[in-house]
């Protein structure tokens, strides 16, 4: 079953800033405890001032506190007397030089912390919880809020069993990281017990579509075709309507049965040199028959320059005819020409 994650911590570092900005190599726990005690004391002291958030910076050995409030006059006081007194008390407690900045919240109806605190204040004054919730929802939507959800949990109306009730108006995309969702929590201490109030406010997307388009790189301008140049398909019939298997010359296409047969060379033994054959798809003349290469032991002896080469060509006119070779079995006898007999 899905549970609700803290909307501020879920978006921390993405579109929400840290509320304590400092770094310490040693004594980190001591400084963190000092921040928590300082914020709790300020909220208790400025309870009627409508404090939304408190941010702490530590530049060097100094302390800078930023307070966002809907009633800055209560904190500053007449002629700045209250803020000076507050500054002296904080400096005495922290033993640091303290600077206080006051920021006014112009629309408290759109601040989740102030909305939850206003509902808690009404519940402590015995106002009906449904009426307080409906009033907060209507005022937030009237000031331009896109969505709001208010949840009240505890012994509502003094019931014996605690329960929860909530109102939701508008849209509330909790899974969208770019959504600007504010979250606040407050407690109402009544005679029947403690009632917890939670408020979610959706103010829109921080990175909208217009800003996202500006971040994208601009597309390259498309080149326009020159008017004096015809279209590619109209250039002398060389366009896309040509038949790639037609009369292109050679034997590239058409009927492959008209192609002259290519005489392949006989297989070459492993001892002979390798013969590279051209690709079969290129037109070439008929290959010459290659005589088989004999092994070195069976190759006929080549004549040297000292030996006389026997000519197999017919002799010239008037030259004596060669005598027929003798029989291998009877070297003393001569072969008789065909047609000659003993009785000739």
Curated annotation (Swiss-Prot):
Instruction: Name a GO molecular-function annotation.
Output: rRNA binding
Keyword set includes Zinc: no
Which residue stretches belong to region Disordered?
217-344
In this protein, which residues make up the domain named KH type-2?
A: 38-106
- The source's superkingdom equals Bacteria
GO CC annotations, alphabetized: cytosolic small ribosomal subunit
Q: Which InterPro entries match?
A: KH_dom, KH_dom-like_a/b, KH_dom_type_2, KH_sf_prok-type, Ribosomal_S3_C_sf, Ribosomal_uS3_bac-typ, Ribosomal_uS3_C, Ribosomal_uS3_CS
Q: Which UniProt keywords apply?
A: Ribonucleoprotein, Ribosomal protein, RNA-binding, rRNA-binding
List compositional bias (Basic and acidic residues) regions by residue number. Answer: 219-259, 335-344
Give a GO biological-process term. Answer: translation
Pfam family, any one:
Ribosomal_S3_C
User: How is the quaternary structure described?
Assistant: Part of the 30S ribosomal subunit. Forms a tight complex with proteins S10 and S14.
Q: Which family does it belong to?
A: Belongs to the universal ribosomal protein uS3 family.
Q: What does this protein do?
A: Binds the lower part of the 30S subunit head. Binds mRNA in the 70S ribosome, positioning it for translation.
Question: Protein name, please?
Answer: Small ribosomal subunit protein uS3
């Amino acid at each position: 079953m899905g549970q609700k994650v803290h909307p501020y911590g879920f978006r921390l570092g993405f579109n929400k800033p840290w509320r304590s900005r400092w770094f310490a190599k040693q004594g980190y726990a001591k400084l963190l405890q000092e921040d928590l005690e300082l914020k709790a004391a300020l909220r208790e002291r400025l309870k009627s001032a409508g404090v939304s958030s408190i941010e702490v910076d530590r530049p060097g050995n100094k302390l800078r506190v930023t307070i966002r409030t809907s009633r800055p006059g209560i904190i500053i006081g007449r002629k700045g007397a209250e803020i000076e007194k507050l500054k002296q008390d904080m400096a005495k407690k922290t033993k640091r030089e303290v600077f206080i900045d006051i920021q006014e919240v112009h629309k408290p109806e759109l601040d989740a912390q102030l909305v939850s605190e206003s509902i808690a204040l009404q519940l402590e004054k015995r106002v009906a919880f449904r009426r307080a919730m409906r009033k907060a929802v209507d005022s937030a939507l009237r000031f331009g809020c896109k969505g709001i959800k208010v949840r009240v949990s505890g012994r509502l109306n003094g019931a014996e069993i605690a329960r929860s009730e909530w109102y939701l108006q508008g849209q509330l995309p909790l899974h969208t990281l770019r959504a600007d969702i504010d979250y606040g929590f407050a407690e109402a201490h009544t005679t029947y017990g403690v009632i917890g109030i939670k408020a979610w406010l959706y103010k829109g997307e921080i990175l909208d579509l217009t800003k996202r388009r500006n971040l994208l790189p601009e597309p390259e301008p498309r080149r326009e075709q020159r008017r004096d140049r015809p279209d590619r398909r109209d250039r002398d019939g060389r366009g896309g309507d040509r038949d790639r298997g037609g009369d292109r010359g050679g034997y590239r296409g058409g009927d492959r049965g008209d192609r002259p047969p290519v005489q392949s060379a006989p297989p070459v033994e492993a001892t002979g040199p390798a013969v590279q054959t051209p690709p079969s798809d290129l037109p070439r003349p008929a290959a010459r028959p290659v005589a088989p290469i004999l092994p070195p032991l069976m190759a006929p002896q080549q004549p040297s320059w000292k030996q006389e080469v026997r000519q197999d060509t017919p002799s010239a006119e008037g030259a004596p005819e060669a005598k027929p070779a003798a029989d291998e079995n009877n070297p003393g006898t001569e072969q008789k020409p065909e047609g000659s007999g003993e009785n000739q």
